[in-house]
Amino acid sequence: MTTGTIDVTIGLDVGKTAHHACAMLATGEIIYDKPLPQDEDQLRKVFTDLQACGTVLVVVDQPNTIGALPIAVARDAGCLVGYLPGLAMRKAADLYPGRSKTDRRDAFIIADTARTMPHTLRAVDRDNEVLSALKMLSGFDDDIAKDATRTINRLRSVLTQIYPSLER
């Protein structure tokens, strides 16, 4: 993912009912470090308030399921969106002191990693969502084909047991 010039990087450790956000300027200065509820209006307010500082990049640790709302709100607010994969997150966490795993620490690591090592980020774009939907539909087709084959083979087996001369 290419990030270009980003003025504010928001690391968002997503959760089921609440998230923790850590926003940093390009200089590394933390300008926001608070929990956020899973609420569209409050997410939008934070994103738009931080846009006063310039271009905003929102980086999440989980782009699907519980991370879908912050991503949708960030896109709608005009923010860039990125994703820090789990393996990159774990490796980045090893670079920071301490071993405790807290939402605040994770949000800080996400933001700082996105700011200092943008090559670790993955794009969260709509094409990936379409591709995921197509993979799911393709999986359904595979399941249906396997079920049809299984049914035909079972029917053939039962008919052969009843009337063996059908095998010829």
Where are these predicted regions, by residue range?
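Phosphate- and other anionic-substrate recognition elements at nucleic-acid/protein interfaces
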Residues: 1-168
